[in-house]
């Protein structure tokens, strides 16, 4: 997948042009996938190039909520859907455009023959553009517009905000259903205090980068990918109240039964599948170890079913 960070005429798809999926696509949930898949399928049917057009917000911008995916994982996921070209200019580059300027710019820069968006898509300065205006602007130019209905979960529209709320509440099945895949993290393993190894339950320690959405603190059934293999695992997310007096430091510790290798400096994928229990302060380290062992057993049983 080719990635472009600035607007410029690209002549994508040559004489056959391109089909462009438009949106912010922050979580690549089932609604986002419907829009992207629509553009990819249209492009394949017409010999055109499948394209995603999105935009990049400043790191400190809170307009769209905390992040669900890293930039690298987002790119990999979009590429896996069959997208060949990914345009992602800075928001500052497009925020002052009128709806007309925005649409004409997309058509010109992407050599677009078809535009795909969700029914809640807005564009142009002050979000003045709507799907209906998009149709009106594109019709005289012979550009097809396809507006996808919002995906539904439990009879309500799917959104990244709902996914964040589900994660905050520890409702992993709901988050995963709306994402269309298990919620997962892929952060670098760093050295911890070594307590897990002392207890006989060595863990991998990962830190959530600033700006990422945190699930509810607690113990989770997870599975961890190391190389090409998946392992049942148990993950504790929180401030380690039994051994840590600094409640501002959040850690993500995963115990992988049966794995003994060195993962420091690597970035294994940890998928979240079920919330088991809230974080708590144990009176003894033996109680802490028993909790970890129990969670690991639950994880192994979960994936054996």
Annotate each predicted stretch with a short phrase.
Residues 9-65, 70:
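N-terminal catalytic cores of NTP/NDP-binding nucleotidyl/phosphoryl-transfer enzymes
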Residues 21-23, 53-54, 86-90, 114-119, ...:
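Short beta-strands and strand-loop turn motifs
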Residues 2-10, 87-88:
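Short acidic-hydrophobic, aromatic-tinged amphipathic segments that line or gate anion-handling sites
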Residues 192-305:
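Phosphate/ribose-recognition catalytic cores of enzymes acting on nucleotide-derived substrates
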Residues 59-141:
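N-terminal Rossmann-like or analogous alpha/beta NTP/dinucleotide-binding catalytic cores
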Residues 138-238:
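Glycine-rich, Lys/Arg-enriched anion-binding loops that position phosphate/diphosphate groups
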Residues 9-13, 93-96, 152-156:
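A short acidic, often aromatic-flanked loop/helix-cap motif at beta-alpha or helix-coil junctions
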Residues 29, 78, 115, 175, ...:
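Residue-level signal for inorganic ion chemistry
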């Amino acid at each position: 997948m080719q990635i472009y960070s600035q607007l410029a005429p690209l002549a994508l798809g040559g004489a056959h042009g391109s089909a462009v999926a438009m949106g912010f696509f922050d979580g690549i949930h089932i609604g986002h996938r419907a829009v992207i898949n629509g553009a990819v399928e249209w492009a394949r049917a017409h010999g055109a190039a499948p394209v995603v057009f999105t935009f990049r917000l400043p790191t400190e911008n809170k307009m769209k909520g905390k992040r669900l995916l890293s930039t690298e994982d987002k790119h990999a996921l979009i590429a896996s859907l069959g997208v060949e070209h990914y345009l992602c200019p800075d928001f500052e580059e497009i925020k002052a455009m009128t709806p007309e300027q925005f649409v004409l710019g997309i058509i010109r820069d992407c050599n677009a023959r078809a535009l795909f968006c969700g029914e809640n898509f807005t564009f142009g300065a002050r979000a003045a553009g709507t799907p209906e205006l998009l149709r009106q602007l594109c019709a005289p130019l012979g550009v097809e517009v396809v507006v996808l209905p919002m995906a539904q979960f439990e009879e309500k529209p799917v959104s990244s905000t709902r996914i964040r709320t589900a994660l905050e509440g520890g409702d992993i099945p709901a988050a995963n259903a709306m994402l269309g895949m298990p919620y997962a993290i892929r952060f670098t393993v760093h050295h911890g205090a070594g307590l897990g190894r002392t207890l006989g339950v060595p863990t991998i320690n990962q830190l959530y980068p600033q700006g990422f959405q945190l699930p509810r603190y607690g113990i989770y059934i997870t599975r961890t990918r190391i190389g090409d293999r998946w392992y049942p695992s148990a993950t504790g997310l929180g401030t380690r109240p039994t051994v840590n007096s600094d409640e501002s430091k959040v850690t993500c510790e995963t115990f992988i039964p049966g794995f003994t290798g060195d993962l420091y400096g690597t970035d294994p994928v940890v998928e979240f599948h079920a919330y088991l229990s809230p974080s708590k302060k144990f009176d003894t380290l033996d109680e802490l170890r028993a909790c970890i062992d129990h969670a690991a057993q639950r994880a192994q049983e979960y994936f054996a079913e």
